[in-house]
Amino acid sequence: MKRLIVLLGVAGVSLSAVFVRWSTAPSLILALYRMAFSAALMAVPVLAGRRRELKSLTRRDVLLCLASGLFLGIHFAAYFGALRATSIASAVVLVDTEVFFVAAASALFLGQRLPRRTWPAVLLAFAGSAVVALADSAAGTNALLGDLIALAGAAAMAVYTMIGTVCRQRLSTSVYTFLVYTSAAATLLAAALLSGTPLAGYGPVNGLTALGMDCLLYTS
């Protein structure tokens, strides 16, 4: 059963990248749709069954969730943008370097260090990421820029993960996820409005693409 769950999770992440490349909407709008649909899907169970927990939230809880959502929104905007600028393989590999940023931040700010036996795997993964970036640098400036955007997305995801570690000590998964997804959607909406990117007019296919990514996420 665990293997099936892992397989579904990998399939969901992999196919979502393909959906982004397939879509014709701007990457910022696709990320906004993605987060808005996710927040809407989480709203029903949370508002129906977690009202007491929502009322008990402290100001600190809310601010941390808002900050976490801010960085999640940045992550998706960067990740989806990278998928348009570089190859799917490069974008996915470089975004997954999030673990390097988390390990570094944990050591610097939390005093947590990786066990020695895990360092060879980390260094091997880092070397692989460097090879990907070097290969893309030969492919042109656009691909290299996409790699840098993917790394920015990885850094944002790391901050989201670190803040989430703190939040999850007090909040249930459903409430935390709902608040973070809502914050991420609001962040992306603000970015779209400030950049003058139209919010609609991209056809139903792009909306279904974002909804399809959500379905893949929740089934995995």
Task: Describe each PLM feature range.
Residues 26, 87, 172-173:
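A helix-boundary/kink motif common to multi-pass secondary transporters
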Residues 63, 92-95, 111-131, 140-147, ...:
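Loop-to-transmembrane alpha-helix entry segments
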Residues 30, 176-177:
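Juxtamembrane helix-start motifs in multi-pass secondary transporters
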Residues 42, 66, 105, 114-136, ...:
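Hydrophobic transmembrane alpha-helices of multi-pass small-molecule transport proteins
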Residues 39-46, 99-107, 129, 161, ...:
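Hydrophobic transmembrane alpha-helices of multi-pass small-molecule transporters
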Residues 29, 35-40, 80-113, 153:
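Specific alpha-helical transmembrane segments that line the substrate/conduction pathway
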Residues 1-32, 38, 70, 74, ...:
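Glycine-/small-residue-enriched transmembrane alpha-helix faces in small-molecule transporters
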Residues 218-219:
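Conserved small/polar residues in nucleotide/adenosyl-binding loops
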